Amino acid sequence: MDRYILSLDEGTTSARAIIFDKNSNVLGIGQYEFPQYYPKPGWVEHNPEEIWEAQVKAIKTAIEKAKIEANQIAAIGVTNQRETTVIWKKDGKPVYNAIVWQCRRTAEMVEEIKREYSDVIKEKTGLVPDAYFSASKIAWLLDNVPGLREKAEKGEVMFGTIDTFLIYRLTGEHVTDYSNASRTMLFNINKLEWDEELLEIFKIPDGILPDVKESSEIYGYTKILGPEIPVSGDAGDQQAALFGQAAFEEGMVKATYGTGNFILANTGRMLLYSDNLLTTVAWGINGKVNYALEGSIFITGAAVQWLRDGIKIISNAAETEELATKLESNEGVYFVPAFVGLGAPYWDQFARGLIIGITRGTGREHLARATLEAIAYLTRDVIEEMEKLIQIKELRVDGGATVNNFLMQFQADILNKKVIRPVVKETTALGAAYLAGLAVDYWESMEEISQLWRAERVFEPQMDEKTREKLYRGWKEAVKRALGWAKVVS
């Protein structure tokens, strides 16, 4: 009987399930969207029950489309939007909506903590203090949901990022992996354990925290599909994508183009620190931990969604390529999509979106092009920071926006580096599948996985240096004008 791996890819706007075979081929995909809720300006929430329902439907659809039986699934891997915070009771019922990674409700709380503890947090967690991470979200829930702090002190509730919530629902086990734990701002990445001092700073009882495991091991078994199936892979979405790109060697870099852009560089066993980038755990396997440098860009693909749903100048994302190629250049129009502040390398919670360079002749093609170019500029901002510490020859790319050939070519041009798009686009889900499969000997080794990675297209830089640097200077000027804007108008 042929065996397969089921990967659960729980994103910011949809839950997906993908069936992979031993050669990394996709046999079936299920995908269901779920809503985001915005109770106040800057607040972003999900209903965890809607995530679970969407995930279960996605699993069933993927199995149907793959035309396989549940007993052919050798293992399940989980990958997830990171930092998003859920607290639930022991019966699995959430006590409040999930607070999403994009949510800014705790920005002022974090600013206060940052003044006193910024260096401590950076040294222990590798993170820049920001409302983006889980710690302040947990603190907010404990302080604002009636009776929750008391329940937490008694050990009656559990905290988890979305992976932990899904694994608990699947297996009854309260666990996470190193990569997800490293995004909470409570996990010491040197000692690989929850940190007492950080828990004290945020006033979080340790009894609500999950056990931290390797990224590839059996966490428990699920009978949700009938037969007992091991759940044996877990990694945050960006770390999973790095693994799915087979970026196993030091200095290998990938960029995922999704709701936001996330650039990770494998630094091997080395903990490298940068003032403007995050240091994070890439994965833990076979008793060894790999670290990574990360640049997190909050809004990229979401800016394209805004063109479609916000100002309604396109009907679908693919239109942006067609519109952008109608112009020879951006004609001086820049768009800084700082809808929720700016992440790496700026780390300005108070930056806001800006479109500059508009004239009477500016049309929707200019806005479409400026949006795509912004994604590439933001990515270069991060790569330049990384190159202060490591040498980067090429960029492996994945995520929805990589189908946009204009964007990929412009990315190669503005970086002056090769941009390589793989055959298998589902690298995040594939990474979780690989981690799950390794734990049950479906794949024997990381060397075997490396042999499966194949390039679909290589984009070579074609732009002359003078044009490249002129465009980038314009971008830097536009960003300056966006920084701190929320403070100016508050």
Swiss-Prot record:
Keyword ATP-binding on entry: yes
Source species, domain of life: Archaea
Pfam entry (one): FGGY_N
InterPro entries linked to this entry: ATPase_NBD, Carb_kinase_FGGY, Carb_kinase_FGGY_CS, FGGY_C, FGGY_N, Glycerol_kin
GO molecular function: ATP binding; glycerol kinase activity
SUPFAM superfamilies: Actin-like ATPase domain (SSF53067)
Binding site for sn-glycerol 3-phosphate: 12, 82-83, 132, 237
Entry annotated with the keyword Nucleotide-binding: yes
UniProt: glycerol binding residues: 82-83, 132, 237-238
GO BP, one annotated term: glycerol metabolic process
EC number assigned by the record: 2.7.1.30
List of residues binding ADP: 12, 16, 259, 301, 400, 404
Chain positions recorded as ATP binding sites: 12-14, 259, 301, 305, 400
Reaction(s) catalysed (UniProt annotation): glycerol + ATP = sn-glycerol 3-phosphate + ADP + H(+)
GO cellular component annotations of the record: cytosol
Keyword list, A-Z: ATP-binding, Glycerol metabolism, Kinase, Nucleotide-binding, Transferase
Annotated pathway: Polyol metabolism; glycerol degradation via glycerol kinase pathway; sn-glycerol 3-phosphate from glycerol: step 1/1
Primary role: Key enzyme in the regulation of glycerol uptake and metabolism. Catalyzes the phosphorylation of glycerol to yield sn-glycerol 3-phosphate.
UniProt family annotation: Belongs to the FGGY kinase family.
Name of the protein in question: Glycerol kinase
Species whose genome carries this gene: Pyrococcus furiosus (strain ATCC 43587 / DSM 3638 / JCM 8422 / Vc1)
